[in-house]
Swiss-Prot record:
This is Formate--tetrahydrofolate ligase. It is an enzyme of class 6 (ligase). ATP binds at T65, P66, L67, G68, E69, G70, K71, T72. GO terms for molecular function: ATP binding; formate-tetrahydrofolate ligase activity. It comes from Vibrio cholerae serotype O1 (strain ATCC 39315 / El Tor Inaba N16961). HAMAP family: FTHFS (MF_01543). Pathway: One-carbon metabolism; tetrahydrofolate interconversion.
Length: 582
């Protein structure tokens, strides 16, 4: 098969006007950005307000290998399969971060004959939404240090007299707003800002700081969770940046930077319209990671798509313990929209990897041995798929297992896996998906199974009620969402929890950040572990996103580059064509 980028370039694409019309948008409801992408105006929702919503399908997966198991391929392939069955359909996916593109995982446009196109435009910058988030985030960071500098330079009374503004008296040791950038750079995890030459302070006041990747910014979560421009502005104004010398929260509104941050993101709130290789309209919007953020595309994109199409296919990052959990307990709470069907993507290689018999590590190629017949490893790793099926079932959402087929897969093992699934006591539909090799033709059976499941009523049940205390919410996700025995708060996290509860933040949701490579917080533990401890080392307040962010185990909010990063394969030829992007 040709490389993804060559398949994409060899496929004729429709003008974006044609795709917009196919989706049901009017000419004044979108603005073209080149030939193959457009920004969709939120004004279209005024026209569509009384139109019934279509079915909402959420694609999730087993616990993945470091290179992923084809969730985006399946999302796009399923959308194309539904179109082959003459259904009105749209797909919604996240905007890829350049961190993984240049790091380990490569692009995030799907692959083979189930891609969003042009894939190089999607993977590299798109319409600049991530850059807008980065700029707005770092504006707040600059505003904090500027305010500390001027208040301390002048003294609080003189500052108030000269500016007519109250002194915020920010405690430099309690600034909780880091800086961000859209690259993997471990050297920036811990930095010192405001350093000066001896005897000078023109660069500000020295303090410890750090960088997160832009996908982990609270503003990225806000972009994905806001319902409209007014809600975006409200949420940005609620962001807590620091605490003052008395321990009171200091918000963006206090700093009078919230309006400028919202202005920086005024175009980012509009989803970007593109197309699959088979012309299915696709909305790309927001890019929070699922391991260190809430891992789903935007509520706004879902709202537009479900008003326009009979079926909307979207995905939650990583396994069902990650993006799916957060879709059900964070996103659904904000949107009021719950899935009509879940698709659980499984692969032979992924299940064998979950047997614990193979050593797969980020940054290393998948060993060929993983594709060789190994019935014992498949049987052992099947426990992971069963866990994810049971996990989805507890939310009351009908499920279909999509076995994403690789060219190297053994036909006998595929048959063995289908039989294992069909023998489960809680009957679940299953289909082999060949979207990568065959596009929509390879996912028609999967599409039929999904349509059938969408007819069944859901009994959606989140893991916790919003009225219970934060510590009980954390425990609910760990125990019911992961199968843990208990959570273990570090001394720092326990102090932070007490402070958050005292300040009235018990009503917020919780977002646990952990490794995606295990259901537990230890990436080395494969399969379906139970009764483990979830160590929570730190809690971060995201008052604008309306959740408390719990850092579990050793997870980092700024990734690092591997020994052999993906960027080494990237180049550009004399005609401006990008080479080496996958």
């Amino acid at each position: 098969m040709l490389p993804d980028i060559e398949i994409c370039r060899a496929t004729p694409l429709a003008p974006i006007d044609t795709i917009a019309q196919k989706a049901g948008l009017h000419a004044n409801e979108y603005e073209s950005h080149g030939q193959h992408k457009a920004k969709v105006s939120l004004h279209c929702l005024e026209r569509l307000a009384n139109k019934p919503k279509g079915k909402f399908i959420l694609v999730t997966a087993i616990t993945p290998t470091p290179l992923g198991e084809g969730k985006t391929v399946t999302t796009i392939g399923l959308a194309q399969g539904l179109a082959k069955l003459n259904h009105s359909v749209m797909a919604c996916i996240r905007q890829p971060s350049m961190g993984p593109i240049f790091g380990v995982k490569g692009g995030a446009a799907g692959g083979g004959y189930s891609q969003v196109a042009p894939m190089e435009e999607l993977n590299l910058h798109l319409t600049g939404d991530i850059h807008a988030v980065t700029a707005a985030h770092n504006l707040a960071a600059a505003a904090i240090d500027a305010r500390i500098y001027h208040e301390q330079r002048l003294g609080y009374a003189d500052f108030e007299r000269r500016t007519g503004m109250p002194a915020l008296r920010i405690d430099p040791k309690q600034v909780i707003w880091k800086r961000v950038m859209d690259h993997n750079d471990r050297a920036l995890r811990m930095v010192t800002v405001g350093r000066n030459e001896p005897g000078k302070n023109i660069n500000g006041y020295e303090r410890e700081d750090g960088f997160d990747i832009s996908a982990a910014s609270e503003l990225m979560a806000i972009l994905a969770l806001a319902s409209d421009l007014r809600d975006l502005r409200r949420r940005i104004g609620n962001v807590v940046l620091a605490y003052d010398l008395d321990g009171n929260p200091v918000t963006t509104e206090d700093l009078k930077v919230a309006g400028a941050m919202a202005v920086s993101m005024k175009e980012a709130i509009e989803p970007t319209l593109m197309q699959t290789l088979e012309g299915v309209p696709t909305l790309i919007h927001a890019g929070p990671f699922a391991n260190i953020a809430h891992g789903n595309s935007s509520i706004i994109a879902d709202e537009i798509a479900t008003r326009l199409a009979d079926y909307t296919v979207t995905e939650g990052g990583f396994g069902s313990d990650m993006g799916f959990e957060k879709a059900c307990n964070i996103k659904a709470k904000a949107s009021g929209k719950t899935p009509d069907c879940a698709v659980i993507v499984a692969t032979l290689r992924g299940l064998k990897a979950n047997s614990g018999l193979y050593d797969l590590r980020p940054g290393q190629a998948v060993p060929d041995a993983l594709f060789a017949p190994d019935s014992a490893a498949l049987q052992a790793g099947f426990a992971n798929l069963k866990w994810h099926i049971d996990n989805v079932n507890q939310y009351g959402v009908p499920a279909v297992v999509a076995i994403n087929r690789f060219p190297q897969d053994c036909a006998e093992e595929l048959e063995q896996l289908v039989k294992l699934i069909e023998a489960l006591p809680n009957r679940v539909s299953v289909a082999i998906s060949e979207g990568f090799a065959k596009g929509g033709e390879g996912t028609k059976l999967l599409a039929e199974k999904v349509v059938e499941q969408c007819q069944h009523p859901t009994k959606f049940t989140p893991l916790y009620d919003s009225g219970i205390p934060l510590d009980e919410k954390l425990k609910a996700v760990a125990v019911k969402g992961y199968g843990a025995a208990e959570i273990a708060l570090s001394d720092k996290a326990a102090q932070q929890l007490a402070k958050l509860q005292t300040q009235g933040f018990d009503h917020l949701a919780v977002c646990l950040a952990k490794t995606p490579l295990s259901i537990s917080t230890d990436p080395a533990i494969k399969g379906a572990p139970r009764d483990f401890i979830v160590p929570i080392r730190e809690l971060r307040l995201c008052a604008g996103a309306e959740f408390v962010y719990a850092l579990c185990g050793s997870v980092m909010t700024m990734p690092g580059l591997p020994e052999k990063p993906s960027f080494m394969a990237l180049d550009i030829d004399q005609h401006g064509n990008i080479v080496g992007l996958s």
